[in-house]
Amino acid sequence: MITARQSRAARALLGWTQETLADKARISLTALKRLESESGLDVYETTRDQARRALEAAGIVFLSTDKGQGVLLVDDHGSKPNPSNAAR
């Protein structure tokens, strides 16, 4: 399950606004704001799922351990060489 903090962190890594994620996830902006709220508002599981799928499609990996939760942005799935690493 995607948390409010994970959603906000993932958007920050991607440089996406709430409007961008709502559009890519095909959910309303209001639904996304509810998901990202810390006030405990009810959110449909389908809303969480659609947001998670959109973020994962953009390269986000959701992390969850007994010590906490987080997000990771995978570097373009390895499809392009990174010029800054080519000489190393």
Give short role names for the model-derived ranges.
Residues 7-20, 81-82, 86:
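Short basic helix-loop element that most often maps to the first helix and adjoining turn
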Residues 30, 41, 55, 74-75:
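Short Asp/Glu-rich motifs
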Residues 60-88:
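Helix-turn-helix/homeodomain-like alpha-helical modules used for DNA recognition
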Residues 26-43:
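Recognition helix of helix-turn-helix/homeodomain-like DNA-binding domains
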Residues 1-2:
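A detector for short, charged/polar N-terminal pre-domain segments
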Residues 45-62:
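DNA major-groove recognition helix of helix-turn-helix/homeodomain DNA-binding modules
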Residues 9, 23, 34, 53:
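DNA-binding alpha-helical recognition surfaces that contact promoter or target DNA
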